[in-house]
Amino acid sequence: MRSRASAEGIAVLGLRRRGESPVCRRRNVVVCFWGDRSCVEREGCVRG
């Protein structure tokens, strides 16, 4: 689980550096894993 969580965390951190939320806009599954309810509700992301 650590390897998967770290991989997802790195992807999200890379996007957060820009100060944007492209993950939410693209309905990326990473949003569900990250636990950002605001993104999940707005984009209707399905939990994986």
From Swiss-Prot:
This entry's Gene Ontology molecular function terms read: pheromone activity
Positions carrying Cysteine methyl ester are: C45
Localization in the cell = Cell membrane
What is the protein's name according to its record?
Mating-type pheromone BAP1(2)
Q: Where is the lipid attached (S-farnesyl cysteine)?
A: C45
State the GO CC annotations. Answer: plasma membrane
* Keywords, ordered alphabetically: Cell membrane, Lipoprotein, Membrane, Methylation, Pheromone, Prenylation
Positions of the propeptide removed during maturation: 46-48
Membrane topology listed for this record: Lipid-anchor
Natural source organism: Schizophyllum commune
What the protein does comes down to:
Activates B-regulated development.
